[in-house]
A protein has these predicted regions:
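C-terminal catalytic/motor cores of large multi-domain enzyme assemblies
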Residues: 1-162
């Protein structure tokens, strides 16, 4: 996972200390029916495969919308992901979920023309594209680290093998 290779994004800032968290606990922003937002946490997310993550997201989102989350289900997050794409937004600027130091926003996936390199030369083809947006606390995560983190996520998504 990109998150396990880029541990500094998994810190929390407590005012006087920066704590590097070993477990990767991913918060997922869930929009509630009343217009509010809550961030349940997938604990030890780095130990789950894609199917396990999807199952946890479905379970936590359903519990959140039914107002049945246990208190520990919304605590201990080390990094949050929000999906503006749910609302067909291409991108947005996410606000860091304190005391975490970074949050990733995923935009709407849409078909776009793209230049594709082939043995015969460049050609235009239709590809699925989306924007990623990372907000981070620059006191802890610098631009080089943030850029490398986004690049590693893009590389994994672009070379996905299901």
């Amino acid at each position: 996972h990109s998150t396990s290779r880029r541990q500094r994004q998994m810190c929390i800032e407590t005012g006087y200390n920066i704590i590097l968290k070993k477990p990767i606990n991913i918060g997922i922003a869930v929009s509630l029916n009343d217009g509010n937002l809550i961030v349940p946490v997938i604990h030890d997310a780095d130990k789950l495969n894609l199917s396990g993550l999807a199952s946890q997201i479905d379970t936590l989102a359903a519990k959140a919308r039914e107002n049945k989350l246990a208190p520990d289900s919304i605590q201990g997050g080390t990094f949050t992901i929000t999906n503006f794409g749910t609302f067909k937004s291409l991108f947005g600027t996410p606000i860091i979920n304190q005391p975490q130091v970074a949050i990733l926003a995923v935009g709407y996936i849409e078909k776009k023309p793209a230049v594709v390199e082939t043995p015969e030369g460049d050609t235009i083809a239709i590809r699925h594209k989306m924007y990623l947006s990372l907000s981070y606390d620059h006191r802890i995560v610098d631009g080089a680290l943030a850029g490398a983190f986004l690049r590693s996520i893009a590389d994994e998504l672009e070379n996905w093998n299901a």
